């Protein structure tokens, strides 16, 4: 089996709806709980997301072994059974990222989300070379994740896009409005644009005006119907609904999220526990919410489950 999508078809499919970034399940001994992960993917994929990103940031890529990444991707491909594109991660240094991209292709993923290089300083030209090498190592469509040290400006991104037809997307986790505006102004419909800031619902409406038609919804993990409804309001530019839900739920949620570094992932697993779908603890160096914070989150979720 191989990808059912060409790179451009994959990008088009992802841009048409909300994106699912599932957590990775761990047991009490911090081992990857693949049966629980597969069961949760069955549940998640029963909701109409446009694509599923296995072992991404919300899935604690940074805490997984490469073997666990492969297992998570293979499980996602199997459990979704063609209902949506499955996007696999690639990251760290260029050699490892190339190996991960090639493994994703062997595991029948439909595309690659390319994470920033690991623990090194680099300029836009260096990042561009990194992205180009990964793109040329696979036939899958690649979405580059602009975040941390992976800061491509519009000129560098356009150069890579010209050289690599399978570079089909840019995910913005930087939040620089001028940079995003320049990228969209230069590249337009050449790329898919994905909102990737933590709790992306916060920024979904203004980002839509910059050509960003979709985003990674961590909240989808525990409130999929709410997340899909909010996304529909964004695409309809229903300001009244958007700002009601921002004030009543999203912004108070971000207050809890901001209590501690790394809570952007931890709070998602806490949310799953709150709705009766526990996924186990987060792996170190992250920390789980305190019981008091968990109680506050449970109260905030309320009847939205």
UniProtKB/Swiss-Prot annotation:
HAMAP family in UniProt: KDGDH
A Pfam family of this chain: DHDPS
Top-level division of the source organism's lineage: Bacteria
Keyword set, alphabetical order: Lyase
UniProt-listed InterPro entries: Aldolase_TIM, DapA-like, Dehydro-deoxyglucarate_dehyd
Record GO biological process: D-glucarate catabolic process
Listed SMART domains: DHDPS
Broad class of enzyme this protein falls into: lyase
This protein's pathway: Carbohydrate acid metabolism; D-glucarate degradation; 2,5-dioxopentanoate from D-glucarate: step 2/2
EC number: 4.2.1.41
Catalytic activity: 5-dehydro-4-deoxy-D-glucarate + H(+) = 2,5-dioxopentanoate + CO2 + H2O
Organism: Xanthomonas campestris pv. campestris (strain ATCC 33913 / DSM 3586 / NCPPB 528 / LMG 568 / P 25)
GO molecular function, one term: 5-dehydro-4-deoxyglucarate dehydratase activity
Family: Belongs to the DapA family.
Name this polypeptide is given: Probable 5-dehydro-4-deoxyglucarate dehydratase
